[in-house]
């Protein structure tokens, strides 16, 4: 079971904040397709992932993780069709647009809005520890149709390098270290956030 401070391991951190009881709001959650934060780090760097691909991946991972917790959702594609005429720049700023629409037209009791701030794969075929994979994303849950902010969580993890070694010890440490991909890190974050969300019921 996860605490509200961090997930079960002490290296994959999730910070969560509850603003009001959220139990009834989890009856049917509409998941908004994630978007890239304006400070997104990924495609601007070697080893980076284009923001449209990163947001698509994280949206899918979070959706599947929430479903695995037994929480009913409004399918992402159904949500996207319902809001296809809403200007994206406006909608991500004003969650009220999502909450009202999802609550009144899709039967949602809440909406989950997410943004990806970093989605970067490791760089360097032989020494990825110098530039390890790193992922940051955050989610906010709003009550539908009223739009009240209920809960938020932020996941931030960069794989640390192995302990400093020298000579043959360095080679052995590199072989023992499993260099995570951004996809693997994001999966851990999605599962941790979904677990926290389920615990908050």
Residue ranges: model-predicted function:
Residues 1-5:
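Sec-dependent bacterial lipoprotein signal peptides
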Residues 7-84, 186, 190-201:
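A structural "domain/chain start" motif
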Residues 23-27, 103-110, 141-151:
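A short, structured loop/turn motif at beta-sheet edges
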Residues 73-122:
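Short, solvent-exposed, polar/charged sequence segments at loop or secondary-structure edges
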Residues 110, 133-135:
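Hydrophobic core residues within well-ordered beta-strands of beta-rich domains
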């Amino acid at each position: 079971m996860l605490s509200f401070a961090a997930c079960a391991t002490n290296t994959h951190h999730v910070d969560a904040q509850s603003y009001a009881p959220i139990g009834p709001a989890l009856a049917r959650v509409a998941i908004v397709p994630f978007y890239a934060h304006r400070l997104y780090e990924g495609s601007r760097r070697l080893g980076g992932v284009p923001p449209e691909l990163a947001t698509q991946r994280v949206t899918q991972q979070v959706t599947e993780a929430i479903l695995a917790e037994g929480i009913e959702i409004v399918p992402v594609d159904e949500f996207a069709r319902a809001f296809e005429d809403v200007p994206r720049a406006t909608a991500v700023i004003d969650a009220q647009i999502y909450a009202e629409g999802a609550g009144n037209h899709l039967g949602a009791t809440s909406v989950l809005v997410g943004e990806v701030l970093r989605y970067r794969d490791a760089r360097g075929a032989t020494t990825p520890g110098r530039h390890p994979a790193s992922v940051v994303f955050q989610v906010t849950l709003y009550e539908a149709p009223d739009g009240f902010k209920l809960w938020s969580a932020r996941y931030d993890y960069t794989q640390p390098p192995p302990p400093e070694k020298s000579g043959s010890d360095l080679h052995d440490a590199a072989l023992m270290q499993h260099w995570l991909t951004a996809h693997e890190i994001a999966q851990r974050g999605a599962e941790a956030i979904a677990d926290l969300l389920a615990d908050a019921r």
